[in-house]
């Protein structure tokens, strides 16, 4: 067999950036009701996003019909691409015809939706440790697509350069930064900015902003006009189905994590 590269295709090890849909109950009626409740008011937030169905939270004897769960996800316009399971769950998890994926968590604490966002004076961020939610935002290596095992990271990693975007971002556009991200123009509805570090937006944020996507709980989001579809730090997110308080909506703010909660605080610029 020739080892020469083909001009028509290549096969390479890689990884996929995806969400985990974490199944925590075998009660399909309860699961369906929660999905409807979560997304009936904001059906576009995860529209056409791909997800991996994670069944590792189920008890050893519990099984769920993955075809039914895949159908539920399709109903809210999310596409299941595989299953994450414990080794003892592999036999039945593979029966749905979805590939088994390996998940490598970057940090032990799991993510949860931020149901409340207190507004207060800035304080030092506290260490995060808590429960898990329906969804977790996964970093680019969370759902493995055949990538070889990663070698241990060095104790001190070189900091990635800051990415500066000096143009408006329109609906459908996405920016990804391996370090910090600075945006000098508006982030419109339907646009998305993602960073492994902090995000600074010196214009209105009306789309989605996701900071610390590899599990960096110390990441923050700063913007001069907060009107977002979604904000997220290390997978802990908040959408507009939970309205923002008047003293931060449309204002200059910083967003950080404190004990697994999103803290949204006005910036004192004067």
Curated annotation (Swiss-Prot):
The entry assigns this protein to a family as follows: Belongs to the MinC family.
Name the residue ranges with Low complexity bias: 116-129
- Cite the PANTHER family for this sequence: SEPTUM SITE-DETERMINING PROTEIN MINC (PTHR34108:SF1)
Described function:
Cell division inhibitor that blocks the formation of polar Z ring septums. Rapidly oscillates between the poles of the cell to destabilize FtsZ filaments that have formed before they mature into polar Z rings. Prevents FtsZ polymerization.
Gene3D superfamilies linked: 2.160.20.70, 3.30.70.260
Keywords attached to this Swiss-Prot or TrEMBL record, sorted alphabetically, are:
Cell cycle, Cell division, Septation
HAMAP family in the record, alphabetically? MinC
Q: What is this protein called?
A: Probable septum site-determining protein MinC
Q: Which organism is it from?
A: Burkholderia pseudomallei (strain 668)
This chain is encoded by the gene named: minC
Q: How does it assemble?
A: Interacts with MinD and FtsZ.
| Record has Magnesium as a keyword | no
Region of interest called Disordered, as start-end residue ranges on this chain: 105-129
- Gene Ontology BP annotations: cell morphogenesis; division septum assembly; regulation of cell division; regulation of cell septum assembly
């Amino acid at each position: 067999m020739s080892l020469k590269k083909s001009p028509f295709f290549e096969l390479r090890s890689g990884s996929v950036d995806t969400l985990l849909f974490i199944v925590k109950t075998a009660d399909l009626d309860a699961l369906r009701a929660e999905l409807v409740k979560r997304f009936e008011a904001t059906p576009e937030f995860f529209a056409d996003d791909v997800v991996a169905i994670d069944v590792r939270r189920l008890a050893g004897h519990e099984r769920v019909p993955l075809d039914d769960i895949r159908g539920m996800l399709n109903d809210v316009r999310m596409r299941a691409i595989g299953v994450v399971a414990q080794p003892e769950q592999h036999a039945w998890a593979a029966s749905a015809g979805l590939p088994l994926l390996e998940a490598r968590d970057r940090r032990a604490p799991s993510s949860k939706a931020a149901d409340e966002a207190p507004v207060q004076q800035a304080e030092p961020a506290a260490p995060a440790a808590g429960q898990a939610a329906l969804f977790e935002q996964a970093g680019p290596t969370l759902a493995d697509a055949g990538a070889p095992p990663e070698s241990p990271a060095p104790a001190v990693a070189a900091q990635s350069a800051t990415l500066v975007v000096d143009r408006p971002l329109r609906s459908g556009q996405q920016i990804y930064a391996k370090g910090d991200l600075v945006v000098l123009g508006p982030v419109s509805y339907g646009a998305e900015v993602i960073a492994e570090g902090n995000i600074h937006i010196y214009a209105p944020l009306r789309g989605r902003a996701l900071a610390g996507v590899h599990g960096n709980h110390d990441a923050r989001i700063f913007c001069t006009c907060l009107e977002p579809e979604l904000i997220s730090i290390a997978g802990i997110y908040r959408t507009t189905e939970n309205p923002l308080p008047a003293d931060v909506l449309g204002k200059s703010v910083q967003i950080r994590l404190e004990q697994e909660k999103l803290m949204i605080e006005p910036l004192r610029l004067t």
